[in-house]
Amino acid sequence: MGTRFVNTRRMFLGQVVMLVAAVARRAWAQAYDSVRYQPLVRPVVVPLDDLTMPAKAFPFTADGMTLASAAEPNQPVRLNGMVVRLSKGDNTPERFKAVCLKCPHEGCDVEFIGDPGRVPAEVTGAIGKVSKPLYICPCHNSTFKIDDGSKLFGPAPRGLWRFHVTAVSETAVEIGEVEEDALLFT
């Protein structure tokens, strides 16, 4: 056995170990819903006047940085998102949810469907009657809940990546963090 074969085998085994560790980390995070967030380059501020009613959505763009463990580390990344008011009442961060509009299946831009009558027949056939707005990927009909971006239907391997609403003032909703995996896979 030559040194070249041993080095090649060690490199291969090292790559296999890294792949298994990455898959295990992701499975662990999904199983225990322990989502880790990273700060955005600067918080996104959405006027509260644009989110007065439940199920009212507002699009935004956020700037982040890829993680040190990403294929291209510490690079600027622009993320399109949508913030939604979930219910009436006092203006606390829990009343608002924000998601990344990039489908985790193949990276297509997800659409906010505010009118349940516009939901494709394939989706209603799979999940039943729709009474609330949804996020739908136009590429393969992956469908996600408005409440938290969790997956309802389709080939997407998981729900939408989430942003963290960090504060709500008298005039604005502030989005200051994004789910760590969004910075690895975008």
What is the meaning of each model-derived region?
Residues 1-20:
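N-terminal secretory signal peptides and thylakoid transit peptides that target proteins
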Residues 18, 109, 114, 143-145:
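Secreted/processed peptides and extracellular or luminal domains of membrane proteins
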Residues 28-125, 167-186:
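N-terminal pre-ligand scaffold of iron-sulfur
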